[in-house]
């Protein structure tokens, strides 16, 4: 989108605050339905970020796949769960919650220090220097594929690991 800089900055701040509030809603709301709706807000804000950066195909894929399919599937699965058994003897904070939060905070701090201390030069082995790319002959989906295999190789692989963890967690919850 061709927006003026103040409007673009306002939309970035607005979408960023929507992402932060939605993310907090996902992890802090006790009702799983509200948590799933907060996840939908996060995914919609992410797709709007893609629209702001002129990546319309990625934004449409984000909306169709994640909001339209996966989030609806999550809400559908949560509605079939028996919610009353999850709220019996509800304690606001337990010892396990404290231990878990300390482990998560320490992992987060170690991850941030690792990311800031790592030299990321040379991580991606396939670079643009050893490829002959004619931009005129490539479609948008081919350009996305090239970017995913060159510039965004590491984030793409990290997202696949996160999705694999989510799938394993969903299977573990479903088996109980």
From Swiss-Prot:
It is found in: Plastid, Chloroplast thylakoid membrane. The keyword Cell membrane does not apply. It is an enzyme of class 7 (translocase). It comes from the Eukaryota. Its EC number is 7.1.1.-. One of its GO terms (molecular function) is NADH dehydrogenase (ubiquinone) activity. It holds the Pfam family Oxidored_q3. GO terms for cellular component: chloroplast thylakoid membrane. InterPro entries: NAD(P)H-Q_Oxidoreduct_6, NADH_UbQ/plastoQ_OxRdtase_su6, Nuo/plastoQ_OxRdtase_6_NuoJ. Gene3D superfamilies: NADH-ubiquinone/plastoquinone oxidoreductase chain 6, subunit NuoJ (1.20.120.1200). Keywords: Chloroplast, Membrane, NAD, NADP, Plastid, Plastoquinone, Quinone, Thylakoid, Translocase, Transmembrane, Transmembrane helix, Transport. It catalyses: a plastoquinone + NADH + (n+1) H(+)(in) = a plastoquinol + NAD(+) + n H(+)(out); a plastoquinone + NADPH + (n+1) H(+)(in) = a plastoquinol + NADP(+) + n H(+)(out). Disulfide bonds: none annotated. It is a multi-pass membrane protein. The chain crosses the membrane at residues 10-30, 32-52, 61-81, 92-112, 152-172. Belongs to the complex I subunit 6 family. PANTHER family: NAD(P)H-QUINONE OXIDOREDUCTASE SUBUNIT 6, CHLOROPLASTIC. NDH shuttles electrons from NAD(P)H:plastoquinone, via FMN and iron-sulfur (Fe-S) centers, to quinones in the photosynthetic chain and possibly in a chloroplast respiratory chain. The immediate electron acceptor for the enzyme in this species is believed to be plastoquinone. Couples the redox reaction to proton translocation, and thus conserves the redox energy in a proton gradient. NDH is composed of at least 16 different subunits, 5 of which are encoded in the nucleus. This is NAD(P)H-quinone oxidoreductase subunit 6, chloroplastic. It comes from Atropa belladonna (Belladonna). The lineage of its organism: Eukaryota, Viridiplantae, Streptophyta, Embryophyta, Tracheophyta.
């Amino acid at each position: 989108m061709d927006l003026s800089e103040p409007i673009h900055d306002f939309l970035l701040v607005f979408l960023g605050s929507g992402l932060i509030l939605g993310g907090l809603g996902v992890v802090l709301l006790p009702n799983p339905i509200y948590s799933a709706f907060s996840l939908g807000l996060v995914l919609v804000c992410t797709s709007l970020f893609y629209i702001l950066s002129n990546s319309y195909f990625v934004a449409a894929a984000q909306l169709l796949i994640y909001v339209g399919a996966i989030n609806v599937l999550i809400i559908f699965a949560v509605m079939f769960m028996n919610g009353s058994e999850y709220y019996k003897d509800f304690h606001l904070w337990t010892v396990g919650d404290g231990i878990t939060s300390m482990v998560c905070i320490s992992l987060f701090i170690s991850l941030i220090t690792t990311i800031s201390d790592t030299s990321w030069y040379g991580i991606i082995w396939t670079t643009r220097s050893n490829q002959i790319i004619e931009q005129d002959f490539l479609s948008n989906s081919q350009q996305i594929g090239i970017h995913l295999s060159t510039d965004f190789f590491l984030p793409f692989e990290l997202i696949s690991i996160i999705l694999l963890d989510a799938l394993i967690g969903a299977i573990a919850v479903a088996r109980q």
